[in-house]
């Protein structure tokens, strides 16, 4: 059953163009037509191997990112632990609960705001020395527009042999700055 959210009641004037996943309109989960072409265009635009649109927004993308990192970890005998900046979105916490992952928080000194979490590469490196984390998770840019030094944090993660996972939900534009500030261009794994 497919139904547009406006339920056929016109209020913006564009509802007759609002179609959903019906024959000939392509489907997000099985893209073959215009959506597949758009994903291909996005891959070329961003310069990445493959783009797949999420169907449930950033929350689903966070779950997917954590699941992929969890599957790639080498030590599967220990309970999985991830090192994370404390300003992570609640979808990250829900994903950790769903995947049975423990969180060890990066708590920067002097940060008084719940939204601000100005972590440094040094803090990440120190945290990784004390942790058996399979990955590091940060939000960049955060809810206040701040972005830590991803290039240096990614280097610290690589030195420790763990991937850097970045929630970049508020930073799609970063690819188009010169030079690019996109987390993947700066060394993040996902």
PLM-predicted stretches and their roles:
Residues 3-5, 21-24, 30-31, 146-148, ...:
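Generic structural "secondary-structure junction" signal
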Residues 41, 45, 51, 57-190:
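Conserved PLP-enzyme active-site core in the AAT-like
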């Amino acid at each position: 059953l497919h139904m547009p959210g406006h339920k056929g009641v016109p209020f913006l004037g564009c509802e007759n163009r609002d179609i959903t996943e019906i024959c000939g309109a392509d489907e997000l989960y099985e893209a073959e037509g215009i959506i597949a072409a758009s994903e291909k265009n996005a891959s070329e635009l961003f310069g990445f191997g493959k783009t797949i649109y999420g169907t449930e927004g950033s929350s689903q993308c966070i779950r997917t990112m954590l699941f992929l990192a969890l599957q790639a970890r080498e030590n599967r005998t220990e309970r999985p632990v991830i090192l994370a900046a404390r300003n992570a979105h609640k979808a990250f916490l829900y994903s950790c609960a769903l995947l049975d992952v423990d969180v060890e928080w990066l708590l920067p000194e002097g940060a008084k705001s719940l939204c601000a979490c100005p972590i440094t590469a040094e803090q990440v490196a120190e945290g990784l020395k004390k942790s058996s984390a399979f990955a590091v998770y940060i939000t960049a840019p955060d809810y206040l527009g701040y972005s830590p030094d991803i290039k240096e944090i990614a280097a610290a993660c690589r030195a420790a042999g763990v991937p850097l996972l970045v929630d970049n939900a508020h930073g799609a534009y970063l690819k188009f700055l010169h030079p690019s500030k996109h987390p993947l261009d700066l060394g993040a794994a996902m």
